[in-house]
A protein has these predicted regions:
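Short linear proline/tyrosine/threonine-rich motifs used for host-factor recruitment
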Residues: 257-261, 268-270
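Short, Lys/Arg-enriched, disordered terminal segments
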Residues: 1-2, 271-273
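ER/Golgi luminal nucleotide-sugar-dependent glycosyltransferases, focusing on the catalytic module
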Residues: 1-248, 254-255, 266
Length: 273
């Protein structure tokens, strides 16, 4: 088996310990680890060098959240050298609305925990790898965060990416909300050298730049195969809850504003700068 390519983006240094535990599970295989940060966190860097001595560490400009650093890494590697790719980052706690994703409560650290779940234990990591032995599975994560296209990103950004990458997307295609997964490396070739970090604005939430969120979806849409869940799929009750949730809860983002409606009544509005 070829080495596994791992990109780990560290914005919140206090959350590095969560990623480290996942990396220790992944490290049972040969890997090439690329670590990106926007500041030089000396204690974290020292720990990475001690634990993963071959890691390549770079300090990058703070653009495009975790997506622009991922693009940076994609543009500098030869994907033919890898069978699999793992993407990890320090997902912050969610302490304000919206706190529901895919019909599930993702408040506090729950979203991060769902995203890291595929490699959080040795058993979960093995299940994820086993799924990727199937020809039709090209990406694996946790079912709580495997989503379908929605109105949470301005469609003009998706339209531009569709033309630039010469791909098509639809409301039926799935993506991993929060972009942490293990996937077959070759599906990302379509992205190589088509985007660059300079295409992204500074990482300021609510700035009106939806390019990172459009790319989040594109990472799933470029996938010609299936996004599988290592922990199965929703039960009947969970599916009904999700359906009801979608009927009563609407979250829409445009280049001008963000709106949340419950039963058609606006409960949250925020204009973008």
């Amino acid at each position: 088996m070829k080495p596994i390519l791992v990109h780990m983006h560290i914005y919140y240094p206090h959350l590095y310990k969560d990623l480290k535990q996942c990396m220790l599970n992944i490290n049972t295989h040969e890997l090439d680890l690329y670590v990106t940060m926007v500041e030089e966190h000396s204690e974290v860097i020292s720990d990475i060098k001690a634990t993963f001595p071959d890691a390549k560490i770079e300090i990058l400009e703070n653009r495009g959240f975790d997506i622009a650093p991922f693009i940076h890494v994609l543009n500098k590697v030869n994907l033919d050298n890898y069978d699999l790719l793992v993407k990890l980052h320090t997902k912050r706690d969610i302490n304000t609305i919206p706190f529901l994703v895919n019909g599930f409560d993702v408040g506090g650290g729950k979203w991060r925990n769902y995203l890291l779940n595929f490699c959080k234990t040795e058993e979960n990591w093995k299940k994820s790898l086993d799924l990727l032995n199937s020809d039709d599975v090209t990406m694996v994560s946790d079912y709580h965060v495997i989503l379908k296209q929605d109105d949470n990103v301005d469609s003009k950004y998706l339209d531009k990416l569709e033309k630039k990458l010469k791909i098509s997307y639809s409301s039926e295609r799935e993506f991993v909300g929060g972009t942490m997964f293990v996937a077959k490396a070759n599906i990302f070739k379509v992205l190589q050298n088509k985007l660059k970090p300079e295409d992204f604005s500074s990482s300021i939430r609510g700035s009106g730049d939806d390019l990172p969120y459009a790319c989040e979806r594109i990472l799933g849409f470029i996938n010609s195969g299936k996004i599988a869940s290592f922990n199965g799929k929703k039960g009947v009750l969970e599916r009904y809850i999700t359906l009801i949730f979608k009927l009563i809860y609407k979250h829409k983002i445009t280049d001008k504003k963000e709106t949340i409606k419950i039963l058609g009544i606006p409960v949250y509005k925020k204009k973008k700068n």
